[in-house]
Amino acid sequence: MDRGAVVGFLLGVCVVSCLAGTPKTSWRRVSVGEDVSLLPAPGPTGRGPTQKLLWAVEPLDGCGPLHPSWXSLMPPKQVPETVVDAACMRAPVPLAMAYAPPAPSATGGLRTDFVWQERAAVVNRSLVIYGVRETDSGLYTLSVGDIKDPARQVASVVLVVQPAPVPTPPPTPADYDEDDNDEGEGEDESLAGTPASGTPRLPPPPAPPRSWPSAPEVSHVRGVTVRMETPEAILFSPGEAFSTNVSIHAIAHDDQTYTMDVVWLRFDVPTSCAEMRIYESCLYHPQLPECLSPADAPCAASTWTSRLAVRSYAGCSRTNPPPRCSAEAHMEPVPGLAWQAASVNLEFRDASPQHSGLYLCVVYVNDHIHAWGHITISTAAXYRNAVVEQPLPQRGADLAEPTHPHVGAPPHAPPTHGALRLGAVMGAALLLSVLGLSVWACMTCWRRRAWRAVKSRASGKGPTYIRVADSELYADWSSDSEGERDQVPWLAPPERPDSPSTNGSGFEILSPTAPSVYPRSDGHQSRRQLTTFGSGRPDRRYSQASDSSVFW
């Protein structure tokens, strides 16, 4: 068998074993330099004549001291667990593989075991590590499978390698006390059991190995925990039918109801990109300037404008978890794409290169991201790797005029409807303000002029000129008798002259002959001559005495 194929097979089995559950987990502490035997293989199950045994390890030497504690992840059941930071863990490493009973090889011999570590061996169907070191601390797993069936993980053990205890030095002559004989004579009988003179004083017994203090129980009492498993890539040939293999498990730790949204996003993968970068910080803060305009925009998955598909669950709780709670699904109309039954997976029918892209599956619980994963779906020829970046992307330069004559500037985004409406409202308000100010100024000026005219007339200072008709409207009122004036028919229209005036405007101006037109004196009113001019016949004069009340 080709060694590369064997290594690839073992790595695949190791990954599968790490993702699978661990039905049996134990803890073991050893000291540096010991020979350790781990994970004995179970007996034959009768499912096949030959079994594959795979031992692997996930190094935990960079995670600091570890100790188990009772955790209530699924109340009321309690299991021993430990909290390990994912940043300190390394990829699983295969240690050894064996066949039980030995299987025939392609060369005619028997395939027994393969070992990839110098200090590891398979002895009596168990993994043996000679002279363990502190760097050997980790999670060791055993996976068992038949020749034609995938391996399944059956046992695991957490191995913690502690420093070796300091050996006790043998006693030396300096440890003997020369004065023990003299002091022993006067001692009380109660000390008769003490060592006699000349006996070396033994050092105190070594302290027992330090035991890790029992940690308090770890229990999640509130919130929801979401666990997601997604394949990182799916390769297809045009015309095939396949579906995404996404597994989502939600565990509620209290009796509160919650809503869960499973959102699918899609990003195009340009052929000019060597790889796609997923900026995890932008998933939680998509409106940051760095996420809106990253420097590597064509090859970055930082922000999105639309959702490909959404399946929402409402009214979920600990006793009614998804998918049993009320569900509602929406999907953009894409040919050849549909939901896989009532699950959260996508189903591709008659797949084509247009379906290729980077797909993100994001789980929201009460509008907050709780888990997410990505899948690269493409043909083998157009496959591009996806890398997850923790920091924010570099911010791209602002859009500016092109510096090269043959390179066009990217088109500016059209203004939004909200900006247009805001501009129209502001313009209308400004125009109405200008019109209102103009009307107010005109009214103010007109009122001031009218007030000045009324005030000058009412003051009685200086002459006042009025316009009257040029006809003899008051010919019958020239009598000095007050009684005659009382008999004048006021409501009768005045008699118009026989021949209208042709030299004037039809009106006459009364010119006063004294500083005051109607001077007053005690007991009587004086009469003054009024001269008309500018109309009718210039040789005609009318002498008229009247009270000032005639004009005002």
UniProtKB/Swiss-Prot annotation:
> Which keywords does this chain's UniProt record carry?
Disulfide bond, Glycoprotein, Host cell junction, Host cell membrane, Host Golgi apparatus, Host membrane, Host-virus interaction, Membrane, Phosphoprotein, Signal, Sulfation, Transmembrane, Transmembrane helix, Viral envelope protein, Viral immunoevasion, Virion
Kindly give the Pfam families that the UniProt entry links to this protein.
Herpes_gE, Herpes_gE_N
**Compositional bias segments (type: Pro residues):** 164-173, 201-211
Annotated region Interaction with gI: the residues are 63-88
Q: What is this protein called?
A: Envelope glycoprotein E
Q: Which organism is it from?
A: Human herpesvirus 1 (strain F) (HHV-1)
- Where do transmembrane segments lie in this chain? 422-442
Give the range the annotation lists for the signal sequence. 1-20
Q: Which residues lie on this side of the membrane: Virion surface?
A: 21-421
Q: How does it assemble?
A: Interacts with gI; this interaction enhances the Fc receptor function of gE. The heterodimer gE/gI interacts with the Fc part of host IgG. Interacts (via C-terminus) with VP22 tegument protein; this interaction is necessary for the recruitment of VP22 to the Golgi and its packaging into virions. Interacts (via C-terminus) with UL11 tegument protein.
**A single GO BP:** symbiont-mediated perturbation of host cell-cell junction
Report the principal subcellular site. virion
Record's superkingdom? Viruses
Q: Name one GO cellular component term.
A: viral envelope
S-S bonds? C273-C299, C282-C291, C316-C325
> Biased composition, Low complexity: where in the chain?
405-415
Keyword Acetylation set for record: no
Please give the residue ranges the record annotates as the region Fc-binding: 237-382
Check the record and name the InterPro entries matching this protein. Answer: Herpes_gE_N (IPR046463), Herpes_glycopE_Fc (IPR003404), Ig-like_dom_sf (IPR036179), Ig-like_fold (IPR013783)
